[in-house]
């Protein structure tokens, strides 16, 4: 899969002194070893893993991680989810709350597109308002596709999320009341 213009194509095997800067240089052998170590660890401990793509923003790397056993990929923004989906990634979780209706409509369209390819999109929420706005965007999409919803738990930093316990349960129940939203778990 090629997603870059010819001038920006990967230069695998190129001598470092011939590479124009700025450039990302990756030791492919070390990357493969690290991916395999993480996959082996997850299998040994019987855990599902979903790496974050906020640093590499690479569909190719996300697909390699999924081939090694990652459940999917995490991103911070709708635009990052759209870019990875365009590169072939089909299981994406947006780990930040999305509140603006234009972005929620984009997320709803993306959820529909991913569902049509056997994929799924998830979004984090930490308020009843966020759930209602997400449900509204999904309803307005005109699609029967659903969206996974993760209730974000505040881990004590006071940045985002709801306290554990009753507030989290209340949000999970609020998600369950909407036909196109699926409670997919907690995020902390």
Regions found by a protein language model. Name each.
Residues 7-26:
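Generic N-terminal amphipathic, Lys/Arg-enriched alpha-helix
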Residues 19-21, 46, 118-120:
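Short, solvent-exposed beta-strand edge segments and adjacent coil->beta transition regions
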Residues 7-11, 30-61, 74-76:
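N-terminal glycine-rich anion-binding loops that anchor highly charged ligand groups
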Residues 6-8, 187-188:
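Mobile beta-alpha loop/short-helix "lid" or hinge segments that flank ligand
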Residues 26-29, 122:
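Short, surface-exposed alpha-helical recognition segments that flank or form part
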Residues 1-5:
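N-terminal hydrophobic targeting/anchoring segments and the immediately downstream early-domain regions
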């Amino acid at each position: 899969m090629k997603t870059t213009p010819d001038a920006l194509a990967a230069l695998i095997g190129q001598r470092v002194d011939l590479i124009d800067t700025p450039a990302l240089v990756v030791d492919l052998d070390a990357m493969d070893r690290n991916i395999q170590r993480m996959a082996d660890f997850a299998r040994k401990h019987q855990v599902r893993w979903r790496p974050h793509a906020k640093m590499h923003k690479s569909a190719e790397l996300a697909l390699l991680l999924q081939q090694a056993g990652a459940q999917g990929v995490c991103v911070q923004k709708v635009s990052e989810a759209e870019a990875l989906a365009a590169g072939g990634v089909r299981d994406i979780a947006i780990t930040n709350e999305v509140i603006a209706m234009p972005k929620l409509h984009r997320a709803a369209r993306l959820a529909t597109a991913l569902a049509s390819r056997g994929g799924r999109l998830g979004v984090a929420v930490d308020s009843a308002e966020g759930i209602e706005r997400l449900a509204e965007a999904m309803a307005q999409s005109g699609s029967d596709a659903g969206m996974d919803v993760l209730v974000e738990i505040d881990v004590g930093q006071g940045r985002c999320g709801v306290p554990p316990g009753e507030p989290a349960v209340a949000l999970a129940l609020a998600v369950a009341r909407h036909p196109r939203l699926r409670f997919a778990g907690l995020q902390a």
